[in-house]
Amino acid sequence: MSVVDQKAVELPPRISEAGVADYFALLKPRVMSLVIFTALVGLMIAPGHIHPVLGFIAILCIAVGAGASGALNMALEGDIDVLMSRTANRPIPRGRITRGEAMGFGLTLSFFSVMTLGALVNWYAGGLLAFTIFFYVVIYTMGLKRRTAQNIVIGGAAGALPPVVAWAAATGSLSVEPLLLFLIIFFWTPPHFWALALFRSDDYARAGVPMLPVVAGPDATRLQILLYTIVLVAIAAAPWPLGYFDWVYGVTSLILGAGMLVLAIEVYRHRTGSQALRATRRLFAFSILYLFALFAVLLLDVVAKAVAPLIW
């Protein structure tokens, strides 16, 4: 019996004491906030016009679909969540919600988010949302997370799809711009989560999750963080010279990218002691700011272009 299997039987009694706050926690609201924001950007920069009500429905369905994925993820990972200090206070490890209830909740939200998006907006977007949920729950959670150190790299595709779904909701098609947004999030994911994994490696080792620092060691992880950051900075800047986004975005991406690169170099250089811990925590925190700020510039640019004719 593995460590995870031995510990799984020590979960709190499965008598549900769930309240609204517990079900809300299943949705992973912090992750959902990032999904909502990136999806909103994908919707807003799309060409043409979508009725505001349909736009709201699209973002709501994408958010609920993301929450459904979070609930299903927690239902499937209750046995390892109880072993990790970062996740031990989630509703299932605390015995507030049973795994069966979380599974039912997640499946219900998945069904209604996909069907509502498809029926009221378009089935292209609905199909992409269904694929996103499937990829996160089945491919990443069930297939990759406990089996390979590349779990975050491949699984990151699910987190990169919301702006693509939103673009499809607005246009009923795909083009280069949403794929660029996808690539930015996709290559942002490994440095972000590997920085977290570096200072939470004991947690992952205890739970038997083969994150890169556990399998390959911290030095190899630091090198991978640096390499992925270099690729991220290049991809994030590319839409400007390619003519897809304007100079305001381009300059912002270079400034933010320089910050990411400097912090990634610091993580690579400082390998032991308090400096190493501080460097990884700073990169993790800045990476969140980086993605929000990069997408915020795109959103502000759309708003500015819409408002400018009213002012001048």
Swiss-Prot record:
EC numbers, comma separated: 2.5.1.141
Q: How does it sit in the membrane?
A: Multi-pass membrane protein
Principal EC category: transferase
Per the record, its GO cellular-component terms are:
plasma membrane
Under InterPro entries, the record lists: Protohaem_IX_farnesylTrfase, UbiA_prenyltransferase, UbiA_prenylTrfase_CS, UbiA_sf
Output one GO MF annotation: protoheme IX farnesyltransferase activity
Where is the secretion signal located? none
Cellular location of this protein?
Cell inner membrane
Specify whether Protein biosynthesis is a keyword of the entry. Answer: no
- Swiss-Prot/TrEMBL GO biological process terms: heme O biosynthetic process
Principal localization?
Answer: membrane
Please tell me what else the database record remarks about this protein: Carbon 2 of the heme B porphyrin ring is defined according to the Fischer nomenclature.
What is the protein name given in its UniProt record? Protoheme IX farnesyltransferase 2
Q: What is the lineage of its organism?
A: Bacteria, Pseudomonadati, Pseudomonadota, Alphaproteobacteria, Hyphomicrobiales
